[in-house]
Amino acid sequence: KDGKLIFRDEPLDDVFRKIGQVYNADIVVMDKDLAKHMYRATFQGETLDEILRLMKLTVPMKYIEKTFEKAMPNGVYSKRYIEVVRL
């Protein structure tokens, strides 16, 4: 893997699932029509925050972030949870 995320006309639901896997985040598209929105982009080296900011420039969306923590045997586990909604 070369650190690139490449999307070629993929539904946003799939795009956010793949981004979430890479950045250890649960990203949920709350609007069914928006989830089907086809997206094309290449990201390389951006942080999750940068990717979300860039996507807002071309997709009619906003996002609400909630971070949750879960106690694990070896310490506290933190994961980002992000809801994506239509503007």
Region roles according to the model:
Residues K1-L87:
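A residue-level detector for the "anchor" residue at the start of short, highly conserved motifs
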